Regions:
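Flexible "cap/lid" loop of the alpha/beta hydrolase fold
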Residues: 7-12, 16-50
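Cofactor-binding loop segments of dinucleotide-utilizing enzymes, especially the Rossmann-like FAD-
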Residues: 25, 119, 147
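Gly/Ala-rich beta-loop-alpha elbow adjacent to hydrolase catalytic centers
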Residues: 2, 6
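Conserved serine/cysteine hydrolase catalytic core
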Residues: 80-136, 141-144
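Short, well-ordered alpha-helices that flank and scaffold nucleotide-derived cofactor binding pockets
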Residues: 8-15, 135, 162, 166
Length: 171
């Protein structure tokens, strides 16, 4: 969602952004495939848990990757009564998953340098949309991250930082 929002902002307000980093997404409409993650989180009765560790154990029944569970649990908060809650509005995200998956048609070409960083194992297929990306973002570069899926920054944080830092520091 962040990558799509950044691309829309860049296209609507040319010159506002000096460099653009887009992570594992293209300016196209995708089939909504994250709804199951959200439904799983939404189905948990958080009142049954006393610790984050207990919630992580429960989530491990659905999500094998520790790094992915840690990423999801960044949205898990505790209120003053020591009750857990999700920081994001899961119901709204589920209800609007189709709209979130769409990419609006915005005419014009970006003059912003853009880095499209993607996981080689990702189902989002950034390179399948290279021509579409180049049409809208002709100053784009592409950076694959080996052995990473869609959650590149979670799965390979050091490589992610290395690539992004190099791009942002370049002239």
């Amino acid at each position: 969602m962040g990558g799509k929002a950044a691309m829309v902002l860049d296209k609507l307000y040319q010159g506002f952004i000096s460099k653009l980093v887009i992570v594992d997404i293209a300016p196209v409409t995708y089939a909504p495939n994250f709804e199951n993650y959200l439904k799983t989180l939404s189905s948990l009765d958080l009142g049954r848990f006393n610790t984050r560790s207990e919630i992580d154990t429960k989530l491990s029944e659905y999500f094998e990757e520790v790094s992915f569970r840690s990423f999801l649990m960044q949205n898990l908060k505790m209120d003053e009564k020591k009750s857990f809650y999700w920081r994001v509005n899961l119901t709204s995200l589920i209800r609007n998953s189709v709209a979130i998956s769409e990419f609006p048609v915005i005419n014009g070409v970006s003059n912003t340098e853009a880095l499209f960083l993607y996981g080689e194992l990702s189902e989002y297929g950034v390179m399948d949309h290279k021509d579409t990306i180049k049409e809208s973002f002709p100053l784009s570069e592409f950076a694959p991250v080996a052995k990473a899926g869609h959650w590149v920054h979670v799965e390979k944080p050091q490589k992610f930082l290395e690539i992004v830092s190099k791009f942002l520091k370049s002239d």
